[in-house]
Every structure is written in C-alpha cells, then in structure tokens.
C-alpha cells in the first residue's frame, strides 16, 4: 500500500473543520431553505465572512486534542488523551459541549478515578453513551495509522473515554474506517461499502455489541444494516431528504449520524440536482448534510472529513479556508500526520 499525498491529509482536516464551522451555523434549524444556505455559501466565496471568523465547536476541539496527542506520542497514549480532553475543556468550555461529556471530564479531572474509562461507564445508569461524540472527533486516528487493526483498536479505545456503549464507539470505528478507505483514492462506492461491511460484521459480532443493540430494542448489527440501506439508496434515483432522515437519521446518536455522513459523501461524488453545479464535491457534501437538518455540524464534519481525504485540499476554496478558526493548525497538522503515516507505513513494509 502506498501512502496518499499530503493534500488528502490536509484536505481531511480542513474538510472536517469547515464542516463543523459551517454546519454549526445551521444546527438545530428544522427547515433550512436552499436559498438561505446558497446565499450563505456565496458570501463565503466572496470573502465576506473573513471579517468575522467562523468558530469551531466541541467537535473540532476534541478532534484537535486527538491529533495533538497522536503527533506528540508515537505510541497511542490513552492517559495523555484523557488529560488533553479535560485540559482543553477547562481552558475553553464554551464550545457547545454536551452535559454528559462535561460530567465525564469533571470526573476525569477530579483525580478520584484509578481508571480513565470509569467515568464513562457510570453514565446513563451504567449503560454508557451511544452519541456521536466519539465518531465526530476520530479523524486523527485514520490519518496517523495506516493499519486497519490499529485504526479499529484506537478508534474504539479513544471512544471509550466518553462513550461506554458499543453503539457509541462502534460508530467511531466506522467513521475512522471510512476516512481510511477514502484516503486510498479512487474507489467504486459499492466496493467502499463492501470493505466497511466486512470490517463492521466482525466488529459487531462481539457479545457487548450484540447485547447493547438488543437492550435498545434494535436489530443486531445496526451499523451493518445501515450500510446495506446506503447501498440500496445509492442504487435509486428517487431518494428524498425525508427518506434519508427517516432511514439513516440526522440525530445526535452515532447510529443516526455516522451512516448519514457516509451516505452524504458517496451521494455527492456525483452532481446533486438540487445543489449548484459549480460546487466542488466537498462543498456539495457539506451543503447536502446541512439541508438534511438536525445535527448539522457533526454530520457535516464527519462527511467532509471523508470527502477531504478522498478529494484533497484542492476542492476547498481559499476564502472558505481562510474564514475558519484554526485553519493554519489543520494545514500544519495535516503535513505532520502525513509524515507520521508514511513512517509507520514504511516500518510495516520494511
């Protein structure tokens, strides 16, 4: 396996950043009109937003912590990551963190817990969170580790810091795998989905994954079922936004947002009739996610992380990039992650 070019690494981090920043403007809107969205995007094109920088949310704040941790610790270090999450929250708490994860950070910072996973396991009467917080921040794992077993292990482990339910951390695994395969370049959507399905079948066969799904009165293998639904949707020309929200979701649960992000990326590989033809694939992906409503910042950040890894930074207009808080860090870290990825790849093949 050859390493992808640095443009894909920078593109993935910049895409994730822009998906979060732009998606946050529309989060929670029940009916985002195309006219309003397109006018907003035109203002970005013209540079009208440069005077007032678009700020990122907790999605990017935690993604930044993962990136910094994997860059500064050659071996994955869960204690370091836990400390970074807590320190970053205490430094800048007004990023839109949910109360559940705030309680985890408060407990981690108290010094009263011997194991870093214990606070997350106490959440929701011991069931743990199955939200999308673990998935929204995981992009750095995919960009630091070329081997599938490492991606799965570290996506799971990093997720378990805040999401003890397998439905939460399995969503992080799926998102991390999607970014990984997007990094590899040209790939037929069906092949892309088949590869994800092969891995998620194995991930979802463990006892906890099956019991967690049944406890929520879901079918076994919820992520595999969603991936099959994506396949079916891609084979149709008449899929509406209402269909997507009903079958894939647009909520804060991981299983109602990670599959939606993957579908949005794949759907936007081709022109979408209701979106302006002049948009790049990556811009189209962000716009498509926003029009679905709901948890727009998180779905857009995940979808754009995948799209950026696939298409590269060339698809990001300069004024879009310049409008986002932290874009220089994303560029710099993308280059450093590319170097780290290449070193690891070389060590596995030598």
Swiss-Prot record:
Activity regulation (record text): The protein undergoes a dramatic conformational switch from closed to open states upon substrate-binding, which enables specific substrate recognition for the 1''-O-linkage. The glutamate flap (Glu-27) blocks substrate entrance to Mg(2+) in the unliganded closed state. In presence of substrate, Glu-27 is ejected from the active site: this closed-to-open transition significantly widens the substrate-binding channel and precisely positions the scissile 1''-O-linkage for cleavage while securing tightly 2'- and 3'-hydroxyls of ADP-ribose.
Chain positions recorded as Mg(2+) 2 binding sites: 27, 295, 297-298
Protein name: ADP-ribosylhydrolase ARH3
Cell compartments where the protein resides: Nucleus; Cytoplasm; Chromosome; Mitochondrion matrix
Organism: Xenopus tropicalis (Western clawed frog)
Main location as per UniProt: nucleus
Task of the protein: ADP-ribosylhydrolase that preferentially hydrolyzes the scissile alpha-O-linkage attached to the anomeric C1'' position of ADP-ribose and acts on different substrates, such as proteins ADP-ribosylated on serine and threonine, free poly(ADP-ribose) and O-acetyl-ADP-D-ribose. Specifically acts as a serine mono-ADP-ribosylhydrolase by mediating the removal of mono-ADP-ribose attached to serine residues on proteins, thereby playing a key role in DNA damage response. Serine ADP-ribosylation of proteins constitutes the primary form of ADP-ribosylation of proteins in response to DNA damage.
Sites marked Glutamate flap: 27
Subunit structure: Monomer.
Catalysed reaction, written as an equation: [(1''->2')-ADP-alpha-D-ribose](n) + H2O = [(1''->2')-ADP-alpha-D-ribose](n-1) + ADP-D-ribose; 1''-O-acetyl-ADP-alpha-D-ribose + H2O = ADP-D-ribose + acetate + H(+); O-(ADP-D-ribosyl)-L-seryl-[protein] + H2O = ADP-D-ribose + L-seryl-[protein]; alpha-NAD(+) + H2O = ADP-D-ribose + nicotinamide + H(+)
Cellular component aspect of the GO annotation: mitochondrial matrix; nucleus; site of DNA damage
GO annotation, biological process: DNA repair; negative regulation of necroptotic process; peptidyl-serine ADP-deribosylation
The keyword Disulfide bond belongs to this UniProt entry's keyword annotation: no
